[in-house]
Swiss-Prot record:
UniProt keyword list: Acetylation, Activator, Coiled coil, Mitochondrion, Translation regulation
Superkingdom of source: Eukaryota
GO process terms (BP): mitochondrial cytochrome c oxidase assembly; motor learning; regulation of mitochondrial translation
Role: Acts as a translational activator of mitochondrially-encoded cytochrome c oxidase 1.
Species assigned in the record: Mus musculus
Coiled coil regions in record: 190-224
Any GO molecular function: mRNA binding
Family matches, as PANTHER family: TRANSLATIONAL ACTIVATOR OF CYTOCHROME C OXIDASE 1 (PTHR12532:SF0)
Protein name: Translational activator of cytochrome c oxidase 1
Pfam families the record matches: TACO1_YebC_N, Transcrip_reg
GO cellular component, one term: mitochondrion
Annotated InterPro entries: Integrase-like_N, TACO1_YebC-like_2nd/3rd_dom, TACO1_YebC_N, Transcrip_reg_TACO1-like, Transcrip_reg_TACO1-like_dom3, YebC-like
Keyword Nucleotide-binding: no
Amino acid sequence: MMSWAAASLRMTAVPCFRVRCLGFRVGPWGASQHANPGCGAAPHRTLHVSATASAGHNKWSKVRHIKGPKDMERSRIFSKLTLSIRLAVKEGGPNPENNSSLANILELCRSKNMPKSTIESALKTEKNKGIYLLYEGRGPGGSSLLIEALSNSGPKCHLDIKYILNKNGGMMAEGARHFFDKKGVVVVGVEDREKKAVNLERALELAIEAGAEDVKEAEDEEEKNLFKFICDASSLHQVRKKLDSLGLCPVSCSMEFIPHSKVQLAEPELEQAAHLIQALNNYEDVIHVYDNIE
């Protein structure tokens, strides 16, 4: 596992756009279409660098991704991408030229080598009648969970997720949303277009230039090294375009719930949390599970 570090670019200006409630409907794979046009880059930006424990010594990084056989893992990834396509089509239509959220998720599908036939099937509008749902939960050790789902039956999905939580040491719990901020996330490879390696120091410089608030080293499901550039929701596509112009290779561009307050768990609770999140991810209607475990 690669070493993990993070650097935050603290903005001196108050952000123009912030998601505060569960009722705000934003698809997870693109920026809101109602961003404040008056938002601009902060006139002054201070860089704060903070080192954290390396992923190789972080217990949660070791146990959170419980993988089955490679073919099953690949199928699970495609299943989640299919749900994301359906949600993007439901909220913005099937034409990626007019639906930036859909364009973003299709870009991610291509990077994962998702079969064209699978993508075309997910794009069919008659299949996109589900309801977008966001559940708040509490996991082992007082951890907070946000569970995104797309379901044709809201009541059934609610009961099923409640059952999975209760069976695996969790529970439905209001208030989990307050531990997360909705942010734009641009994921890029660790090599630029000229196949030159990009280190964290260089990524920080590019983050400042692109107007990002934070950059983190990360890994995808296949343990490939990546950088995640985190920015205000209203500037997601602007930051992506700038990073692309600076020579980086964006893999995806999406909206995510980023925890601003994390909890540390003892090893038995970490194992229990990993099994809970795996059980939730295995449920067919779940798109993504976010946690605030450190």
